[in-house]
């Protein structure tokens, strides 16, 4: 990527608010300086391979209903809001990360996403990782290893580079350090009372998915953990001692941090554990940087992530129960985005597992609009009152 390559802004740039304009200028300047930028949309994306290509990786999952009307010009209305929002931001050119990315890495998780990627590819080069539907058969693991190899090859060909094993090992060490910092921050919520607002925790983790500099973000997290720990040890208690301790599980929470997370915390609860695909159960999975076949170690780490698209998926329920014990959970709230069939169907098994352990459970099926806010607040308040 040559330096000082002119990066044009969208034709609608002047219509954006100042915050969005500033975001576009920031990413434009980053790209114009010759930097590489790759968008991704799923926790199964092997980020170490992108890192090893010298590219910054940014999450592109849509979390707002702002652009859904634009998306529905192409996509069906009765589709998951995350899918519609993601496509809508690309279609309307309102997301600077999508607009300026060199390419997007998609994956065959749910049916809606994998078909949306065909349309997204018409707007922006999109490479698809073919994720197997399970991982307990040898050919599935071998197939995924090949997908990771093909991603490495795609990035090498696109950028005209060679990604070495040493490059991958450096990337693994950086990501391991980041995940260790995330785990330390998650662990602060095991304190009784919790050391911070769960909304603050979720917002901090969500913001990290837009960072161009892994090491800088890792240092920020490490410093924040130290400050929070020191404040807690000094007697600061930002969370009430009688706040009911809630674990959130289910679909990605980025689009419902305020809708569900803040509602929990304004009704006598505190979110002590994020048990979605960007939470502790995924961050806890490290990679051995000294593994003889480092690419295979990377591939294996990602395939072992628990998600409702996998069959079987017993590990997710087992992990949730372990998190309930670790974080002294009073109740579990499962967030299911409308039309997310895999999480919606699997919620029956989650409810059975959680209630079988003697922990109250509630499922909330919602989208990114505010139309059901009153109903959700009533249900959450009633649920917390029973704990």
Identify the residue ranges that each predicted region occupies.
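Short hydrophobic segments within beta-strands
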Residues: 41, 247-249, 335
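Peripheral docking tails and interdomain loops at the edges
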Residues: 2-3, 348-387
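A charged, amphipathic alpha-helical module
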Residues: 2-36, 149, 153-271, 275-286
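A short, acidic, amphipathic alpha-helical segment used as a generic capping/interface helix at domain edges
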Residues: 90, 311-328, 345-346
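An N-terminal, globular interaction/scaffold subdomain
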Residues: 37-39, 44-94, 102, 109, ...
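Acidic/His-rich segments in extracytoplasmic proteins that coordinate ligands and/or metal ions
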Residues: 87-157
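Proline-aspartate-enriched helix->loop->beta-strand connector
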Residues: 101, 324, 328-333
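Redox- and metal-dependent alpha/beta enzyme cores, enriched for Fe-S-associated oxidoreductases
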Residues: 32, 49-63, 70-71, 251-312, ...
């Amino acid at each position: 990527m040559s330096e000082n390559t002119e990066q044009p802004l969208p034709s609608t740039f002047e219509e954006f608010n100042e915050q969005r304009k500033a975001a576009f200028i920031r990413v434009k300047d980053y790209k114009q300086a010759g930097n590489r930028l790759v968008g991704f949309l799923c926790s199964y994306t092997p980020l170490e391979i992108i890192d090893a290509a010298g590219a910054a990786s940014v999450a592109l999952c849509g979390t707002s209903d702002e652009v859904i009307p634009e998306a529905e010009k192409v996509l069906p209305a009765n589709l998951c809001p995350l899918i519609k929002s993601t496509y809508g931001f690309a279609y309307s050119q309102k997301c600077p990360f999508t607009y300026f990315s060199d390419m997007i890495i998609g994956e065959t998780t749910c049916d809606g996403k994998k078909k949306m990627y065909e349309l997204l590819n018409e707007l922006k080069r999109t490479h698809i990782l073919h994720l197997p539907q399970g991982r307990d058969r040898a050919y599935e693991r071998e197939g995924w290893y090949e997908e990771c190899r093909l991603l490495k090859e795609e990035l090498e060909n696109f950028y005209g580079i060679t990604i070495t094993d040493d490059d991958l090992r450096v990337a693994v060490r950086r990501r391991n350090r980041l995940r260790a910092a995330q785990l330390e921050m998650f662990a602060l919520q095991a304190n009784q009372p919790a050391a911070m607002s769960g909304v603050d925790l979720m917002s901090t983790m969500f913001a990290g998915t837009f960072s161009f500099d892994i090491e800088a973000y890792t240092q920020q997290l490490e410093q924040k953990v130290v400050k929070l720990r020191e404040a807690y040890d000094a007697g600061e208690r930002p969370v009430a001692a009688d706040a009911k301790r809630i674990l959130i599980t289910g679909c990605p929470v980025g689009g419902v941090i305020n809708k569900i997370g803040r509602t929990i915390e304004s009704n006598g609860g505190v979110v002590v554990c994020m048990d979605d695909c960007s939470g502790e159960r995924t961050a806890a999975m490290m990679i051995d940087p000294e593994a003889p076949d480092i690419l295979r170690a990377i591939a294996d780490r990602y395939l072992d992530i628990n998600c409702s698209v996998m069959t079987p998926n017993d590990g997710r329920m087992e992990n949730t129960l372990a998190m309930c014990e670790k974080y002294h959970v009073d109740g579990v709230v499962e967030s299911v985005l409308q039309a997310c069939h895999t999480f919606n169907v699997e919620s029956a098994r989650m409810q059975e597992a959680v209630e079988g352990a003697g922990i109250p459970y509630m499922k909330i099926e919602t989208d990114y609009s505010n139309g059901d806010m009153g109903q959700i607040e009533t249900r959450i308040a009633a649920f917390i009152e029973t704990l």
